[in-house]
């Protein structure tokens, strides 16, 4: 999530001509769409999940209109069960791949990474690797190709004596 926010912020800064936090950056003017910081609303009688779906629908409408947009989706479809989330996410990924659209999609669902095999020219798995050394997590903060193999949630839960 932090990395996605950094990319989104740098896009906005670059588009207004401000300095960015990067060694180099090349972009073309795009509208930025995200599902980050989506909120529910009791006043609108709108659940988090429905608010997220409305945002995704707005993205698809813009793509269908032929607009150039950059999409950032963070853990999409959080408001449903894991099977429905995976199926819906994969279908959305397939639909998005029909358009000329740059997107960053973050997920912790390892099955979603199979989309790279299905769409090898349009989907690329990237991750931040973590090592466990001397009972500590070591972060290298380097974007790597592939799917992370470190299971840090269980490690941290055990370390904090949660499980």
Language model features with spans:
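ATPase nucleotide-binding head domains, primarily ABC-like/P-loop NTPase cores
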Residues: 1-163
